[in-house]
């Protein structure tokens, strides 16, 4: 499977780097208006990323998704959809049991920092392809605090968004790995492991 980014093609296993509570009125504004006070298209919601990145000074790899899904936003943590293979994949690669609680997930991943490229956007449900008016996360705060050796984008959307919004600021390319999303059904857990294990 190939991903096309600005006229270039990358294989899904490519290791090349290029890489508070709201009042009723404010809730209505959040749903129907973006920060520029322009009406949102039907089905869209303006959403703010509400949970912090996972990393410490020992983190060496930074894994970036695009933006939390509806289920992740409900659970207030990354990759909350039960069919997303991310946590199973990480446990397999690190040869540890699959973490169940948020604390277990954080502990497992401290050597591998975790965040998303986008901190707010207009989005329809969980659809990455519907993202509009994206505001990028300040990836530099992690790069300044930890000696990150490799930045990995979890899927093509995260990769494209990183190249567009973050790479010009950080000066650091990202490597593209195939998405762990259930939407990427072409990749079994075994195929994902084969690609991700390169890092």
Feature annotation, model-predicted:
Residues 1-2, 17, 29-30:
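Polybasic, lysine-rich low-complexity intrinsically disordered segments
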Residues 71-130:
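Short, surface-exposed acidic-centric catalytic microdomains
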Residues 60-61, 150:
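Structural motif
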Residues 8, 25-26:
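Short, low-complexity intrinsically disordered segments enriched in A/P/G/S/L with frequent Arg
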Residues 28, 32-60, 81-82, 124-140, ...:
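C-terminal capping/extension of enzyme domains
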Residues 111-158:
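Internal catalytic-core helix/loop-beta-alpha segment
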